């Protein structure tokens, strides 16, 4: 159940940046390939501020929650004419959690490409504002990604800041 009353696209295309071609593919209930992303302590720390790997049960609960709150997508990159999942993102007006699961792809602008496309999605849906519920102070990559897209911190939280973008 994505956003109430809104039909979630199967695919959201993202404009190519240099040699990088991405797309967002609608969550279909299959996520075993993503488990390895959530085993990496550095990745988990960026998400939770902790380093304990996710169990399959926890991963399933996370994806079920996200799928019931917004439009859940896998971020896919085109490699050798094949679409390969490299992360996930969920879009709804109140939050936009994103994970680039492949650590070798972080810092290359993939997150910015995804966030720009989801800002466009928000505009298509007529939203006047978009929010990020919280970015931990230690997650400099995520802070940089959302700031680059125009999001501004507006409220301090226990571990970081809430962000808002006026559309």
Located regions from the model:
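A short, well-structured alpha-helix characteristic of acyl/acetyltransferase catalytic modules
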Residues: 1-61
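C-terminal "cap" of GNAT-fold acetyltransferases
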Residues: 156-167
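Conserved beta-strand in the GNAT
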Residues: 74, 82-95
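A short, internal acetyl-CoA/4′-phosphopantetheine-binding micro-motif in the GNAT/acyltransferase core
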Residues: 76, 95-110, 135-136
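Conserved GNAT acetyl-CoA-binding A-motif
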Residues: 122-135
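A short helix-loop-beta-strand connector motif used in the catalytic cores of GNAT acetyltransferases and
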Residues: 62-75
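Conserved active-site alpha-helix within GNAT-family acetyltransferase domains
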Residues: 112, 137-155
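A conserved short alpha-helix in the GNAT/GCN5 acetyltransferase fold that borders
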Residues: 106, 115-123, 147
């Amino acid at each position: 159940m994505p956003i109430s009353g809104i039909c979630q696209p199967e695919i959201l295309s993202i404009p190519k940046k240099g040699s990088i071609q991405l797309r967002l593919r609608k969550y279909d209930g299959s996520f075993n390939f993503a488990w390895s992303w959530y085993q990496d302590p550095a990745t988990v720390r960026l998400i939770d501020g902790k380093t304990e790997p996710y169990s399959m049960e926890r991963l399933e609960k996370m994806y079920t929650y996200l799928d019931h709150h917004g439009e859940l997508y896998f971020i896919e990159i085109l490699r050798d004419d094949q679409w390969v999942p490299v992360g996930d993102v969920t879009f709804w007006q109140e939050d936009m959690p994103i994970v680039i699961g492949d650590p070798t792809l972080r810092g290359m602008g993939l997150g910015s490409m995804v966030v720009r496309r989801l800002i466009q999605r928000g505009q298509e849906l007529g939203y006047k504002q978009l929010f990020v519920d919280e970015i931990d102070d230690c997650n400099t990559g995520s802070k940089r990604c959302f700031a680059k897209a125009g999001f501004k911190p507006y409220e301090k939280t226990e571990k970081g800041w809430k962000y808002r973008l006026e559309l």
